[in-house]
């Protein structure tokens, strides 16, 4: 059985982080990361774009999330999972296990 589930995505935070605490007392921070890049596919350049919902869970990660604002440039590493929205539709969500701020060089 194949069990690999890893994703690394860099981009810009495009929606204000929302902080919540679950009924079991676990803090969560949710935001959306927008990625834009040029990738090579079959020998051709291709413009890529996506918006990925990010969830950061656990007490040890929450101090870092308070520095995340709209416009923050990040690299996020973690695993993906499916979440069902209130409308009943499923969406992929990246559960962050490591977050690094990208220095803009300013």
From Swiss-Prot:
Family the UniProt entry places it in: Belongs to the PriB family.
NCBIfam families assigned to the protein according to its UniProt record, in alphabetical order: PriB_gamma
State whether it acts alone or in a complex, and with which partners, per the record: Homodimer. Interacts with PriA and DnaT. Component of the replication restart primosome. Primosome assembly occurs via a 'hand-off' mechanism. PriA binds to replication forks, subsequently PriB then DnaT bind; DnaT then displaces ssDNA to generate the helicase loading substrate.
Q: Where do the SSB domain residues begin and end?
A: 4-103
**What species was this sequence derived from?**
Yersinia pestis
GO biological process assignments: DNA replication; DNA replication, synthesis of primer
For this entry, the protein name equals: Replication restart protein PriB
Free-text function comment from the UniProt entry? Involved in the restart of stalled replication forks, which reloads the replicative helicase on sites other than the origin of replication; the PriA-PriB pathway is the major replication restart pathway. During primosome assembly it facilitates complex formation between PriA and DnaT on DNA; stabilizes PriA on DNA. Stimulates the DNA unwinding activity of PriA helicase.
What Pfam family is a match for this entry?
SSB_1
What are the entry keywords?
DNA replication, DNA-binding, Primosome
Record carries keyword DNA-binding: yes
MF GO annotations: enzyme activator activity; single-stranded DNA binding
Q: Name one GO cellular component term.
A: primosome complex
Q: Does the keyword rRNA-binding apply?
A: no
Give the PROSITE patterns listed for this entry. Answer: SSB
HAMAP family noted in UniProt: PriB (MF_00720)
């Amino acid at each position: 059985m194949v069990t690999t589930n890893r994703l690394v995505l860099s981009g810009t935070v495009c929606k204000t982080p929302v902080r919540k605490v679950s009924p079991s007392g676990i803090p969560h921070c949710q935001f959306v990361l927008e990625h834009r890049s040029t990738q090579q596919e079959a020998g051709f350049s291709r413009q890529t774009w996506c918006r990925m919902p990010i969830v950061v869970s656990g007490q040890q990660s929450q101090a870092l999330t308070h520095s995340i604002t709209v416009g923050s440039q990040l690299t996020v590493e973690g695993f993906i999972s499916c979440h069902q929205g209130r409308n009943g539709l499923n969406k992929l969500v990246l559960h962050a296990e490591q977050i690094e701020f990208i220095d803009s060089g300013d």
